[in-house]
A protein has these predicted regions:
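N-terminal pre-Walker A segment at the start of P-loop NTPase domains
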Residues: 47-80
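Conserved helicase ATPase motor motifs in RecA-like P-loop NTPase domains
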Residues: 102, 204, 231-251, 255, ...
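Phosphate-binding P-loop
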Residues: 61-66, 85-94, 233
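Motif I (Walker A/P-loop) of helicase-class P-loop NTPases
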Residues: 104-114, 224, 255
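The Walker A (P-loop) glycine that initiates the GxxxxGKT/S ATP-binding motif of P-loop NTPases
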Residues: 99
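Short, solvent-exposed loop/turn and secondary-structure capping segments
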Residues: 66-69, 209-211, 252-256
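Short, well-ordered alpha-helices that flank and scaffold nucleotide-derived cofactor binding pockets
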Residues: 111-118, 139, 233, 256
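SF2 helicase/translocase NTPase motor core
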Residues: 6, 13-45, 70-86, 92-96, ...
């Protein structure tokens, strides 16, 4: 494995491997320095591989995607805008955590949130498939020495009422986000200019976010995928983390990952999502 040397960090407790295709690509050279308590490193609470994810996420989150964008009030429609145009926004770059089973992705997510917490960004959102998984989130958060009750479910607060938390990690399910008032409730709690962490755990749950055309005709966008896109567009400065060991079974289903900067115009690797899909399908997936 090509890795970052972190002084005092302990090796991962289980053996980690990477595919030949991944090994053929040199990793980036990050300059980001996370803020984490020393005991987390020395006590092996986060392994060297898990600490790498905190560094890479922070490095990516330090910049924004190219260009300015206009988003309508529904957060459904987005288009390129001239630089300096009224109400135009810039989107912060997002990061994809695609480690497989056994890497401890929950603890990696907690580490990313804690790094930002220590830097003063004390509101975060953790989105997952099931409300029962809040226990796992609380366990991973408390493993880093934090109070587990700082992770609170959105379901604790009635729909249409303010989320009365001055700080904390709001745990939300994808099914809940499909509800427009609930989505607005989360956006209102985070507030204008929010630049904290939003985690899309099991991000493949947002598959078919943009709809598709198949042999049986046009398929409408999924409600969960659409809700995920709307949340991202409503929070342009948020530090987005996509988490999934199986990001997409079909490359078309990566439409939810707008913050990766894979498509979007002449300054991106691909002009649009269709061009990206065609290129990947033509080249094949390693």
């Amino acid at each position: 494995l090509q890795s970052i040397r972190i002084e005092g960090a302990k090796p991962h407790p289980t053996k980690l491997v990477q595919s030949a295709a991944m090994a053929s690509v040199a990793p980036p050279h990050p300059s980001y320095r996370p803020h984490l308590p020393v005991h987390i490193i020395k006590s092996d609470i986060l392994s060297d591989a898990q600490l790498e994810s905190v560094i890479y996420a922070g490095d990516v989150h330090s910049g924004h995607l190219v260009g300015s964008w206009a988003v309508d009030e529904t957060f459904d429609n987005i288009h390129a805008a001239p630089e300096g145009a009224e109400n135009a926004v810039r989107f912060r770059r997002g990061w994809f955590l695609g480690d497989g089973t056994g890497c401890g992705k929950g603890r990696q997510v907690a580490g990313i949130i804690l790094d930002n917490w220590i830097k003063g960004r004390r509101k975060a959102v953790w989105i997952s498939k099931s409300d029962k998984l809040i226990e796992d989130a609380q366990r991973d958060w408390s493993a880093l020495g934090m109070e587990q009750l700082l992770v609170q479910p959105l379901s604790r607060f009635k729909q249409g009422t303010p989320v009365r938390l001055t700080e904390g990690v709001l745990f939300v399910t994808y099914a809940t986000l499909r509800n427009e008032p609930r989505l607005r409730q989360v956006i209102d709690w985070l507030g204008d200019g929010f630049d904290g962490v939003v985690v899309f755990d099991e991000a493949h749950a947002m598959a078919n976010a943009a709809g598709s055309k198949g042999e049986r005709g046009e398929q409408l966008p999924s409600q969960q995928g659409r809700a995920g896109l709307r949340l991202q567009r409503a929070l342009p400065d948020a530090r987005i983390v996509y988490v999934s060991a199986t990001g997409a079974t079909d490359v078309r289903n990566l439409a939810y990952a707008e913050r990766l900067g894979l498509w979007g115009g002449e300054d991106f690797p691909f002009a649009n999502r269709t061009e990206f899909v065609q290129a990947v399908e033509a080249g094949g997936v390693a």
